[in-house]
Curated annotation (Swiss-Prot):
Protein function: Induces rhoa activation and activates nppa transcription and myofibrillar organization through the rho/rock signaling pathway.
Start-end of Basic and acidic residues biased regions: 227-245, 323-347
Superkingdom of this protein's organism: Eukaryota
Region (Disordered): 155-184, 227-359
Biological processes per GO annotation: cell differentiation; muscle organ development; regulation of gene expression
KW Cytoplasm (keyword) present: yes
Organism: Xenopus laevis
Gene: cavin4
Coiled-coil residue spans: 45-129
InterPro entries: Cavin_fam
Protein name from the UniProt record: Caveolae-associated protein 4
Lineage: Eukaryota, Metazoa, Chordata, Craniata, Vertebrata
Amino acid sequence: MDHETSSEKDRVNLNRLSMVSEDSVDHDAALTIVAVLDKVATIVDTVQASQKRIEERHREMEDAIKTIQIELLKLAQAHSNTSYTVNKLLEKTRKVSSNVKDVKSRVDKQSDQVQKVESKQEEMLRKNKFRVVIFQEDIECPTKLTVAKQSALDGNLRDDLYPPDDLSSDEEYSVQESRTSRLKKSGMKRINNIKKAFSKESMQKTKQNFGNKVNRLRTRIVTPERRERLRQSGERLKTSGERFKQSIAKAAPKKEAFKINIKKKGKQRTTAEGQEGGKEDETDSEEPTAKPISEEVTYTEVVTVKKKKKKNEENAELLLSQEDEKPSPVPEKTEKPLLKVEKKAESDEIPLVDINLSQ
């Protein structure tokens, strides 16, 4: 018995030891798994952080590229502007060079003329036969000169305008103007002043000044806001008038609505109408309107005309011949035509009659 009990105890102990060993192994495996998972999480975090950094760098690079593109566009625009300005400068330099050439040619011509004048002056100085006239702004030059020659005691003729032989050539001498020349000059000055006053430029300036004054007065009297309101109200009135005209044109009745079918009465009425046609023409022109009998007929437009006696007689004969051939139906109700006379204000003639007679 003791041996069995001891063996059982040993078995129980062994089972316990095996269970403890298995638990320890499982615990170690779980710890290793947790450690591995922690490492993986840290690696993933580092990867995500690196990705974020890379994205930020990419954004910075994109911004830098955009700025570079903008600067390149600006440089291209500046280059185009500079090329345009350079072309203009080249054109101006060409023009200046052409002008410089012209100026050089003119200067050369003037220098040649100056040389010629100097040579002539030298010749005149050598001969001592020259006279100098100095122009002054205050004293105007005369338009005409009158030279009076006097005979000297020696018998030689001398001019009053020329200085004596003893005077030097540099001295000045005055010339008296005639009264007619002065009057002519004053008249020409007045004419020139009048021309300047009534020239195109002066007239344009006066027009501009007058227009500016008128505009100022307009702005003082009527403000621009009020002027805009008046313009808007005028446009509204125009649009409303057009709409009213369109509505009237749409609502206006047609010519077919004004036509009336009137029944014939008989031979007696036709004969009476044929005989008394001339009288009815005169009476119809005097009567402006007649009352309608039927309720359906509301409005008719009838135009009356003067007829000659011959035409009335011919119409009456034609009606009699037509009604002899066809039997005249007896009307149940007599309907009188509604007549409305429209007289022209300008002409004194009686207007035409438009009556449709139908069975």
